C-alpha cells in the first residue's frame, strides 16, 4: 500500500473555529494554504457556486505560492473557473445536483492519481 500526503482544509475543527472567531472567514482556507502549500503542490477546490470568497482566496493563495489548482464547480459563475488551471464544471444549477455530479468526478480523479503515481 502506498500513499500521498493530503490535507483536508475542513477537517481541523480547532483551526476552523479559531479562524472563524479571530480572522475573517473569507481567509479561512487561504491561511491554511499559505501554511501548508509549497510550489508544485495541488489544491483541489470544490464550490457549487464558483463564487465562495473563502474558496476563491484559497485558490489565489495557491497560485501565488506556485501551486496547481483544480476546481470542481457549477457552470454559472466564472470566478473559480478563471482562477484554476483545470475546471470541471457541472452543467447543473441546483447545488445538490452539482454535488451529485462531483461525487464520481473526485473518485475518478483519485483513481487517476493513484494510477499515475503507483501503477
Where are these regions (language model features)?
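Glycine-rich phosphate-binding loops that contact phosphosugars or nucleotide phosphates
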Residues: 1-119
